[in-house]
Amino acid sequence: MGKYQPSFQTKKGWTEVICGPMFSGKTEKLLHKIKRWKIAKISVVIFKPIIDTRQTNIVKSRNGEYDQAITINSPFEIYDHLVDKNYQIVAIDEAQFFSNEIIEVVTTLNEIGTNVIISGLDTDFRAEPFGCIPQLLAIADVVNKLDAICNVCGSLAQRTQRLVNKNTNDNLVLIGDAEAYEARCKLHHSFLTKKHVTVKTKNFKEQVQGKTQ
């Protein structure tokens, strides 16, 4: 899907999603694209959720790049900022923190010809689908799935390791950075509460593991 290049000449807008674990460069890639569009005189507006308190009214990558953003609580607030202005692209950072209302908003924007680019975590610290992102991936025209580097072994990492409050009953959302999270590969991702599996799956794994011992 990465070879597909969205066109600005279509009557319907397109949606692109940039996803991956923490420390995979999602915001960096988002800002890089926005910078290129602005050089080409393409109008872009950026939104971010109010729950992300790490930066105020800006979207900032870990390499220091940043751009101005509008902080909103509800996805429907995006409409208020577009009524009197004709932006060609709406950019949304940290989209996993928005409710499923974001699906309706993105679909509506595409219907009226507005293009949307989104960045967000596709899985949470439990390695399970995160919030609205799976549905956004389903309706996206382009998906950029990024990898990070595992803090333990240096291999490609697809998961986010929470270093504190990492039990099932702990809050799903914990705003933080390197002090609270690391990127991990599947082998080194640790989650304290084991996921429930069926008896058939348990028996199958025991049989396979028994052959390798």
UniProtKB/Swiss-Prot annotation:
The keyword GTP-binding does not apply. It comes from the Bacteria. Keywords: ATP-binding, Cytoplasm, DNA synthesis, Kinase, Metal-binding, Nucleotide-binding, Transferase, Zinc. Pfam families: TK (PF00265). Zn(2+) binds at C150, C153, C185, H188. InterPro entries: P-loop_NTPase, Thymidine_kinase, Thymidine_kinase_CS. GO terms for biological process: DNA biosynthetic process; thymidine metabolic process. It is found in: Cytoplasm. NCBIfam families: PRK04296.1-1. Belongs to the thymidine kinase family. This is Thymidine kinase. The gene is tdk.
